[in-house]
Protein backbone atom coordinates (compact mmCIF):
# COMPACT_ATOMS: atom_id res chain seq x y z
CA UNK A 1 0.00 0.00 0.00
CA UNK A 2 1.34 3.42 -0.96
CA UNK A 3 0.88 6.00 1.80
CA UNK A 4 -0.20 9.37 0.37
CA UNK A 5 1.36 12.05 2.57
CA UNK A 6 0.76 15.80 2.68
CA UNK A 7 3.08 18.17 4.57
CA UNK A 8 1.93 21.33 6.39
CA UNK A 9 4.02 24.34 7.41
CA UNK A 10 7.01 23.44 5.28
CA UNK A 11 8.81 26.74 5.86
CA UNK A 12 9.93 25.04 9.11
CA UNK A 13 13.61 24.20 8.67
CA UNK A 14 13.11 20.49 9.37
CA UNK A 15 11.34 20.18 6.03
CA UNK A 16 14.63 20.09 4.11
CA UNK A 17 17.37 20.91 6.66
CA UNK A 18 18.59 18.98 9.72
CA UNK A 19 15.92 16.24 10.08
CA UNK A 20 14.95 16.95 6.43
CA UNK A 21 11.63 15.11 6.59
CA UNK A 22 10.61 15.92 3.02
CA UNK A 23 13.88 14.64 1.58
CA UNK A 24 13.43 11.34 3.41
CA UNK A 25 9.78 10.98 2.42
CA UNK A 26 10.68 11.60 -1.21
CA UNK A 27 12.98 8.55 -1.25
CA UNK A 28 10.90 6.17 0.85
CA UNK A 29 9.38 3.15 -0.87
CA UNK A 30 5.58 2.92 -0.69
CA UNK A 31 5.30 6.62 0.16
CA UNK A 32 4.06 9.41 -2.11
CA UNK A 33 4.49 13.06 -1.14
CA UNK A 34 1.31 14.41 -2.73
CA UNK A 35 1.47 18.06 -1.63
CA UNK A 36 3.18 20.68 0.52
CA UNK A 37 1.69 23.73 2.20
CA UNK A 38 2.86 26.93 3.81
CA UNK A 39 1.39 30.36 4.36
CA UNK A 40 4.48 31.67 2.54
CA UNK A 41 3.93 30.23 -0.96
CA UNK A 42 7.36 31.35 -2.21
CA UNK A 43 9.14 29.34 0.49
CA UNK A 44 6.79 26.40 -0.06
CA UNK A 45 7.68 26.44 -3.76
CA UNK A 46 11.39 26.44 -2.89
CA UNK A 47 10.93 23.46 -0.60
CA UNK A 48 8.87 21.62 -3.23
CA UNK A 49 11.59 22.18 -5.82
CA UNK A 50 14.01 20.27 -3.59
CA UNK A 51 11.83 17.13 -3.47
CA UNK A 52 10.42 16.57 -6.94
CA UNK A 53 7.94 19.45 -7.27
CA UNK A 54 4.82 18.14 -5.50
CA UNK A 55 1.81 20.50 -5.71
CA UNK A 56 2.12 23.63 -3.55
CA UNK A 57 -0.71 25.15 -1.50
CA UNK A 58 -0.93 28.33 0.57
CA UNK A 59 -4.07 27.13 2.38
CA UNK A 60 -3.99 24.05 4.58
CA UNK A 61 -7.76 23.69 4.30
CA UNK A 62 -7.63 23.74 0.51
CA UNK A 63 -4.82 21.18 0.37
CA UNK A 64 -6.48 18.77 2.79
CA UNK A 65 -9.89 19.11 1.14
CA UNK A 66 -8.44 18.70 -2.35
CA UNK A 67 -5.89 15.92 -1.81
CA UNK A 68 -7.47 13.93 1.05
CA UNK A 69 -4.14 12.46 2.24
CA UNK A 70 -3.74 9.22 4.16
CA UNK A 71 -1.26 10.78 6.58
CA UNK A 72 -0.02 14.29 7.39
CA UNK A 73 3.40 15.61 8.40
CA UNK A 74 2.75 18.81 10.39
CA UNK A 75 5.57 21.32 10.89
CA UNK A 76 5.14 25.12 11.07
CA UNK A 77 5.64 27.82 13.67
CA UNK A 78 5.32 26.89 17.32
CA UNK A 79 2.52 29.43 17.83
CA UNK A 80 0.40 27.78 15.13
CA UNK A 81 1.00 24.13 16.03
CA UNK A 82 -1.82 23.62 18.52
CA UNK A 83 -4.40 25.06 16.13
CA UNK A 84 -3.15 22.85 13.30
CA UNK A 85 -3.24 19.79 15.55
CA UNK A 86 -6.85 20.42 16.55
CA UNK A 87 -7.86 20.88 12.91
CA UNK A 88 -6.25 17.56 11.98
CA UNK A 89 -7.92 15.86 14.94
CA UNK A 90 -11.27 17.29 13.86
CA UNK A 91 -10.68 15.72 10.45
CA UNK A 92 -9.69 12.40 12.08
CA UNK A 93 -6.44 12.39 10.12
CA UNK A 94 -3.41 10.50 11.48
CA UNK A 95 -0.35 12.71 11.67
CA UNK A 96 3.05 13.37 13.09
CA UNK A 97 3.86 16.80 14.45
CA UNK A 98 7.27 18.28 15.13
CA UNK A 99 7.98 19.08 18.78
CA UNK A 100 7.11 21.06 20.87
CA UNK A 101 3.52 20.93 19.46
CA UNK A 102 2.69 24.33 20.94
CA UNK A 103 3.98 27.37 22.78
CA UNK A 104 3.60 25.84 26.23
CA UNK A 105 2.24 22.91 28.21
CA UNK A 106 -1.25 24.42 28.40
CA UNK A 107 -1.56 24.24 24.61
CA UNK A 108 -0.06 20.77 24.32
CA UNK A 109 -2.32 19.48 27.11
CA UNK A 110 -5.42 20.35 25.06
CA UNK A 111 -4.05 18.20 22.22
CA UNK A 112 -3.22 15.31 24.55
CA UNK A 113 -6.71 15.39 26.08
CA UNK A 114 -8.35 15.21 22.67
CA UNK A 115 -6.05 12.43 21.46
CA UNK A 116 -6.96 10.38 24.53
CA UNK A 117 -10.66 10.96 23.95
CA UNK A 118 -10.57 10.10 20.24
CA UNK A 119 -7.90 7.40 20.23
CA UNK A 120 -6.23 9.20 17.33
CA UNK A 121 -2.80 8.33 15.95
CA UNK A 122 -0.51 11.29 16.64
CA UNK A 123 3.26 10.80 16.70
CA UNK A 124 6.12 13.07 17.71
CA UNK A 125 9.47 12.35 16.03
CA UNK A 126 12.20 11.86 18.64
CA UNK A 127 15.16 10.22 16.88
CA UNK A 128 17.29 10.25 20.03
CA UNK A 129 15.10 7.41 21.34
CA UNK A 130 16.89 5.16 18.82
CA UNK A 131 20.41 6.45 19.47
CA UNK A 132 23.28 4.16 20.41
CA UNK A 133 23.38 5.75 23.86
CA UNK A 134 19.73 4.92 24.53
CA UNK A 135 20.05 1.39 23.12
CA UNK A 136 22.98 0.59 25.40
CA UNK A 137 21.33 2.32 28.36
CA UNK A 138 18.15 0.28 27.97
CA UNK A 139 20.12 -2.95 27.67
CA UNK A 140 22.14 -2.19 30.80
CA UNK A 141 19.04 -1.12 32.73
CA UNK A 142 17.28 -4.37 31.77
CA UNK A 143 20.32 -6.33 32.96
CA UNK A 144 20.46 -4.41 36.24
CA UNK A 145 24.02 -3.38 35.37
CA UNK A 146 23.81 0.11 36.87
CA UNK A 147 22.45 -0.88 40.26
CA UNK A 148 20.63 2.09 41.82
CA UNK A 149 20.79 5.06 39.45
CA UNK A 150 22.58 8.21 40.55
CA UNK A 151 22.26 10.75 37.74
CA UNK A 152 22.09 11.55 34.03
CA UNK A 153 24.00 14.30 32.29
CA UNK A 154 22.98 15.47 28.81
CA UNK A 155 24.63 18.23 26.81
CA UNK A 156 23.57 19.41 23.36
CA UNK A 157 25.29 22.52 22.02
CA UNK A 158 24.55 23.18 18.36
CA UNK A 159 25.72 25.89 16.02
CA UNK A 160 24.38 29.44 15.96
CA UNK A 161 20.69 30.28 15.96
CA UNK A 162 21.48 32.61 13.05
CA UNK A 163 20.75 29.51 10.98
CA UNK A 164 17.03 30.00 11.56
CA UNK A 165 16.66 33.25 9.57
CA UNK A 166 18.93 31.75 6.89
CA UNK A 167 16.48 28.84 6.66
CA UNK A 168 13.37 31.09 6.45
CA UNK A 169 12.53 30.62 10.14
CA UNK A 170 13.31 34.04 11.61
CA UNK A 171 10.32 33.53 13.94
CA UNK A 172 12.48 31.20 16.03
CA UNK A 173 14.21 34.31 17.43
CA UNK A 174 10.88 35.85 18.51
CA UNK A 175 9.81 34.42 21.90
CA UNK A 176 6.16 35.21 21.19
CA UNK A 177 6.25 32.95 18.13
CA UNK A 178 8.70 30.28 19.32
CA UNK A 179 8.02 30.08 23.05
CA UNK A 180 11.73 30.27 23.84
CA UNK A 181 15.17 29.51 22.50
CA UNK A 182 17.56 26.60 22.85
CA UNK A 183 15.66 25.00 25.74
CA UNK A 184 12.28 25.07 23.99
CA UNK A 185 13.78 23.58 20.83
CA UNK A 186 16.78 21.42 21.72
CA UNK A 187 15.89 20.68 25.32
CA UNK A 188 12.96 18.49 24.30
CA UNK A 189 15.32 15.67 23.27
CA UNK A 190 17.29 15.51 26.50
CA UNK A 191 14.27 15.85 28.76
CA UNK A 192 12.43 13.13 26.88
CA UNK A 193 15.40 10.77 27.26
CA UNK A 194 15.75 11.56 30.98
CA UNK A 195 12.09 10.74 31.59
CA UNK A 196 12.15 7.70 29.33
CA UNK A 197 15.23 6.09 30.89
CA UNK A 198 14.32 6.78 34.51
CA UNK A 199 10.71 5.75 33.94
CA UNK A 200 9.65 8.43 36.41
CA UNK A 201 8.22 11.91 36.55
CA UNK A 202 10.56 14.74 37.49
CA UNK A 203 10.61 18.27 38.82
CA UNK A 204 12.94 21.14 37.98
CA UNK A 205 15.10 22.14 40.94
CA UNK A 206 17.19 24.80 39.23
CA UNK A 207 17.57 26.64 35.94
CA UNK A 208 19.61 29.41 34.38
CA UNK A 209 19.60 31.01 30.94
CA UNK A 210 22.18 32.90 28.91
CA UNK A 211 21.82 35.50 26.14
CA UNK A 212 25.34 36.86 26.35
CA UNK A 213 27.00 35.19 23.35
CA UNK A 214 24.47 35.81 20.58
CA UNK A 215 22.51 38.71 22.13
CA UNK A 216 19.14 37.54 20.83
CA UNK A 217 15.72 37.80 22.50
CA UNK A 218 15.70 34.04 23.07
CA UNK A 219 18.34 32.24 25.11
CA UNK A 220 21.46 30.88 23.43
CA UNK A 221 22.26 28.67 26.45
CA UNK A 222 20.31 26.98 29.23
CA UNK A 223 21.16 24.63 32.07
CA UNK A 224 18.44 22.78 33.97
CA UNK A 225 18.64 20.63 37.11
CA UNK A 226 16.13 17.80 37.55
CA UNK A 227 15.18 15.28 40.22
CA UNK A 228 12.79 12.32 40.18
CA UNK A 229 10.63 11.26 43.16
CA UNK A 230 13.09 8.46 43.98
CA UNK A 231 16.05 10.86 43.93
CA UNK A 232 17.64 10.32 40.51
CA UNK A 233 19.21 13.63 39.49
CA UNK A 234 19.65 15.10 36.04
CA UNK A 235 21.62 17.91 34.47
CA UNK A 236 20.64 19.22 31.04
CA UNK A 237 22.70 21.72 29.07
CA UNK A 238 21.56 23.07 25.71
CA UNK A 239 22.89 25.88 23.57
CA UNK A 240 23.50 27.43 20.19
CA UNK A 241 27.13 28.39 20.68
CA UNK A 242 29.02 25.68 18.81
CA UNK A 243 31.50 27.76 16.75
CA UNK A 244 31.52 25.78 13.50
CA UNK A 245 28.55 25.82 11.15
CA UNK A 246 28.43 22.63 9.12
CA UNK A 247 27.72 22.65 5.41
CA UNK A 248 24.40 21.10 4.44
CA UNK A 249 24.83 17.87 2.53
CA UNK A 250 28.37 17.15 3.73
CA UNK A 251 28.78 13.70 5.26
CA UNK A 252 29.66 13.93 8.97
CA UNK A 253 33.20 13.00 9.89
CA UNK A 254 34.00 9.80 11.77
CA UNK A 255 34.49 11.62 15.07
CA UNK A 256 31.14 13.43 15.17
CA UNK A 257 27.81 12.36 16.61
CA UNK A 258 25.67 11.87 13.51
CA UNK A 259 22.50 12.54 15.47
CA UNK A 260 23.80 16.02 16.26
CA UNK A 261 25.96 16.80 13.26
CA UNK A 262 28.35 19.62 13.95
CA UNK A 263 27.55 19.63 17.65
CA UNK A 264 29.17 19.60 21.05
CA UNK A 265 27.21 16.78 22.65
CA UNK A 266 27.61 14.37 25.54
CA UNK A 267 25.18 11.85 27.05
CA UNK A 268 25.85 10.09 30.35
CA UNK A 269 23.94 7.80 32.73
CA UNK A 270 25.56 6.74 36.01
CA UNK A 271 24.61 4.26 38.71
CA UNK A 272 26.32 2.69 41.70
CA UNK A 273 27.81 -0.11 39.59
CA UNK A 274 28.26 1.29 36.08
CA UNK A 275 28.74 4.37 33.95
CA UNK A 276 27.69 4.73 30.30
CA UNK A 277 28.78 7.69 28.21
CA UNK A 278 28.29 8.63 24.54
CA UNK A 279 30.35 11.36 22.92
CA UNK A 280 31.50 12.05 19.35
CA UNK A 281 30.03 8.77 18.12
CA UNK A 282 31.93 6.74 20.72
CA UNK A 283 30.58 4.68 23.61
CA UNK A 284 32.35 4.28 26.97
CA UNK A 285 31.17 1.75 29.56
CA UNK A 286 32.89 1.60 32.97
CA UNK A 287 32.24 -1.00 35.69
CA UNK A 288 34.22 -2.29 38.67
CA UNK A 289 35.58 -5.02 36.39
CA UNK A 290 36.97 -2.76 33.69
CA UNK A 291 36.24 -0.40 30.85
CA UNK A 292 35.01 -0.71 27.25
CA UNK A 293 35.49 1.94 24.56
CA UNK A 294 34.09 1.51 21.06
CA UNK A 295 32.48 3.35 18.16
CA UNK A 296 28.76 2.89 17.54
CA UNK A 297 27.47 5.05 14.69
CA UNK A 298 24.05 4.65 13.03
CA UNK A 299 23.96 2.68 9.79
CA UNK A 300 21.12 4.82 8.42
CA UNK A 301 20.02 8.41 8.90
CA UNK A 302 18.31 8.65 12.33
CA UNK A 303 15.54 10.93 11.05
CA UNK A 304 14.79 8.52 8.18
CA UNK A 305 14.59 5.62 10.63
CA UNK A 306 12.35 7.64 12.95
CA UNK A 307 9.94 8.53 10.12
CA UNK A 308 9.86 4.95 8.87
CA UNK A 309 9.10 3.67 12.39
CA UNK A 310 6.24 6.15 12.82
CA UNK A 311 4.66 5.19 9.50
CA UNK A 312 5.16 1.46 10.12
CA UNK A 313 3.47 1.67 13.53
CA UNK A 314 0.49 3.49 12.03
CA UNK A 315 0.19 1.05 9.16
CA UNK A 316 0.33 -1.90 11.59
CA UNK A 317 -2.28 -0.44 13.94
CA UNK A 318 0.21 0.08 16.77
CA UNK A 319 0.63 3.11 19.06
CA UNK A 320 3.15 5.73 17.93
CA UNK A 321 6.75 5.19 19.14
CA UNK A 322 6.56 8.58 20.88
CA UNK A 323 3.20 10.23 21.45
CA UNK A 324 1.65 13.49 22.62
CA UNK A 325 1.80 12.50 26.31
CA UNK A 326 5.57 12.05 26.03
CA UNK A 327 5.87 15.47 24.42
CA UNK A 328 3.66 17.04 27.09
CA UNK A 329 5.77 15.62 29.92
CA UNK A 330 8.89 17.25 28.49
CA UNK A 331 7.15 20.55 27.70
CA UNK A 332 5.93 20.80 31.30
CA UNK A 333 9.54 20.61 32.51
CA UNK A 334 10.54 23.29 30.01
CA UNK A 335 7.80 25.59 31.31
CA UNK A 336 8.90 24.91 34.91
CA UNK A 337 12.48 25.80 34.01
CA UNK A 338 11.51 29.10 32.37
CA UNK A 339 9.50 30.10 35.43
CA UNK A 340 12.23 29.08 37.86
CA UNK A 341 14.95 30.78 35.83
CA UNK A 342 12.89 33.94 35.26
CA UNK A 343 13.49 33.63 31.53
CA UNK A 344 11.51 35.31 28.77
CA UNK A 345 9.08 32.73 27.44
CA UNK A 346 5.43 32.38 26.57
Where are these regions (language model features)?
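Active-site loop of classical SDR/Rossmann-like NAD(P)-dependent oxidoreductases
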Residues: 16, 277-278, 297-308
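Hydrophobic residues in well-ordered beta-strands that form the structural core
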Residues: 7, 97, 122-124, 236, ...
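Rossmann-fold dehydrogenase core element
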Residues: 110-128, 148-151
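Beta-loop-alpha module in the N-terminal Rossmann-like domain of NAD(P)-dependent dehydrogenases
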Residues: 40-42, 51-114
